[in-house]
Structure formats: structure tokens, C-alpha cells
Amino acid sequence: MLALYQPDIPQNCGTMLRLCACLGVEAAIIEPAGFPVSDRHFRRAGMDYLDQVALSRHVSFTAFRAWQIETGRRLVLLSTKASQPYTDFTFRPDDILLMGRESAGVPEAVHASADARVVIPLRPPMRSLNVAVAAAMVLGEALRQVGALAKVMDAPRASL
């Protein structure tokens, strides 16, 4: 699952949901988002793929965290403050990859509540990648590790 913490740029959110649709990954939006889901930029970035995403919405991080604990899934935060490279981390099929806000990441309390934290190594003085690019990189590695990419490749293709 790819979870988006209070996304504030509709184009990035739409792009990440499109990524989830294409790879068969569940998605969650942790409210409040910085835009309505009817936003034209959000819909345009997601194109007609948004209807193909298994999407859940949570009214707050507290509600999301309660759901996450109840389901027993591990919360893996992608953070520029983490020390473990995502390529050295062992992902599990039921992991939830949490992406922070484009403008501010996540608050310290959310950071501390994650079961694990991973980082994409960048050369100095670069600070971060676009959140949708970062999500694609780490989600791709997680799916590769758990063998889920092969399932995507074996799935029947939609007709044009």
C-alpha cells in the first residue's frame, strides 16, 4: 500500500494514484488534503486511472494509525531524515509505504510512530526528489523484493 500524508499538490497526488493503479497497489489518502478530490489538476494527473485504484481515505493520521495497527501492517516512512537506504531495507508484502507532504514532510510524532524509516540517498547538496518520483522508486523496489512485479507482468492487459 502507498499512503499519502496530507498531500498538498494535486498533480503529485494524481500521479501517485495513477502509479498505484498501474502496479495494482492499494492507496490511502490521510486527510486533510490541500485540495478537493474534484480538483481538475488532480483528475488530469490521474487521468482515467483513478477509477482503477483501490483507494481508502482516512479523516486524520490518528484514524489511519488505528486502522494500520488493527490490520497489523508495518508502516514504512520514506523520509529525508532517515538513515537506512531503501535499497538495504527488506520489504514485506503487507508493508504500507508512507509519503509525507510535499511542502513539509510529516510531523515528528508521525515520524516517530513509523515502524521503519528509509531514505533515497542523494548527492550533496541535493535535499529531495519530487514526491511522486520518490514514491515510484521505492514502491518499485518494494514490489521487486516481494515478487509482485512478476504478477503485474502476468496480469491480462486491458484492451484499447
From Swiss-Prot:
Source taxon at top rank: Bacteria
Subunit details: Homodimer.
Entries under InterPro entries matching the protein: Alpha/beta_knot_MTases (IPR029028), SpoU_MeTrfase (IPR001537), TrmL (IPR016914), tRNA_m1G_MTases_N (IPR029026)
Organism of provenance: Beijerinckia indica subsp. indica (strain ATCC 9039 / DSM 1715 / NCIMB 8712)
Signal peptide: none
Function of the molecule: Methylates the ribose at the nucleotide 34 wobble position in the two leucyl isoacceptors tRNA(Leu)(CmAA) and tRNA(Leu)(cmnm5UmAA). Catalyzes the methyl transfer from S-adenosyl-L-methionine to the 2'-OH of the wobble nucleotide.
SUPFAM superfamilies referenced in this protein's UniProt entry, alphabetically: alpha/beta knot
Principal EC category: transferase
Keywords: Cytoplasm, Methyltransferase, S-adenosyl-L-methionine, Transferase, tRNA processing
Keyword Cytoplasm: yes
Subcellular location(s) per record: Cytoplasm
Similarity remark: Belongs to the class IV-like SAM-binding methyltransferase superfamily. RNA methyltransferase TrmH family. TrmL subfamily.
Protein's name in the database: tRNA (cytidine(34)-2'-O)-methyltransferase
Pfam families in alphabetical order: SpoU_methylase
Catalysed conversion reaction: cytidine(34) in tRNA + S-adenosyl-L-methionine = 2'-O-methylcytidine(34) in tRNA + S-adenosyl-L-homocysteine + H(+); 5-carboxymethylaminomethyluridine(34) in tRNA(Leu) + S-adenosyl-L-methionine = 5-carboxymethylaminomethyl-2'-O-methyluridine(34) in tRNA(Leu) + S-adenosyl-L-homocysteine + H(+)
Binding site for S-adenosyl-L-methionine: 78, 100, 120, 128
E.C. numbers: 2.1.1.207
Gene3D superfamilies the record matches: 3.40.1280.10
Entries under HAMAP family matching the protein: tRNA_methyltr_TrmL
GO MF terms, alphabetically ordered: RNA binding; tRNA (5-carboxymethylaminomethyluridine(34)-2'-O)-methyltransferase activity; tRNA (cytidine(34)-2'-O)-methyltransferase activity
One of the protein's GO biological processes: wobble position ribose methylation
GO CC annotation terms, alphabetical: cytoplasm
Predominant subcellular localization, coarse grouping: cytoplasm
